[in-house]
Design a protein with these regions (language model features):
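A generic structural signal for alpha->beta connector loops
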Residues: 32-34, 77, 96
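Conserved small-residue
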Residues: 14, 53, 79-80, 128
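Conserved active-site segments centered on acidic
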Residues: 1-69
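Short, charged/polar "capping" segments at the starts of alpha-helices
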Residues: 43-45, 86-89
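Alpha-helix C-terminal capping/helix-to-coil transition sites in glycosyltransferase folds
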Residues: 73-75
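Short, charged/polar surface micro-motifs in flexible loops or helix N-caps
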Residues: 59, 85-86
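Redox-cofactor binding/interface segments in oxidoreductases and associated redox assembly factors
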Residues: 81-82, 101
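Phosphate-binding/catalytic loops
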Residues: 87-145
């Protein structure tokens, strides 16, 4: 049996924010956390998210986009919502999990040139990393970075 704490990260589409957050937390503190992500209306993982994570040395190419219902009945230590919409519609079946929330800009809504859109994805990736580093630090987990 693993002593890793179980973390579920939720956003609407499970295509950008929660996918990047899953990749970051697995990479930076995966020895302490078993991390999953899901969405309330999942779509495909955004190519921009894959690209900016690759720039950070993290490969999320094979991450599937999952619906939150796939985790019904499973126990988690932490459920983190990374968008206001999902916080409001978050299922109640996560029992005693500690629920945390921070709204991050949706990079999938970015407009402009490809470079301008990638800049938004990079900024959100970096904001997620700071948030998740603090999440792990407060739980006495030394990140691997």
């Amino acid at each position: 049996m693993s002593d890793k704490k179980r973390v579920l990260i939720l956003c609407t589409g499970n295509s950008a924010r929660s996918q990047m957050a899953e990749g970051l937390l697995r990479h930076d503190a995966g020895e302490k956390f078993h991390v999953e992500s899901a969405g309330t209306k999942p779509g495909s993982v955004r190519r921009e998210a894959i690209a900016v994570m690759r720039e950070a040395g993290i490969d999320i190419t094979g991450h599937p986009s999952k619906h939150v219902d796939e985790f019904a009945g499973q126990q988690f230590d932490y459920v983190i919502t990374v968008c206001d919409n999902t916080r409001e519609t978050c299922p109640v079946f996560f029992g005693k999990a500690e629920k945390l929330h921070r709204d991050f800009e949706d990079p999938a809504a970015a407009t402009g040139s490809e470079e301008q859109r990638l800049a938004v994805f990079r900024r959100v990736r970096d904001e997620l990393r700071v948030y998740l580093d603090e999440f792990a630090r407060r739980r006495n987990v030394n990140n691997a970075r």
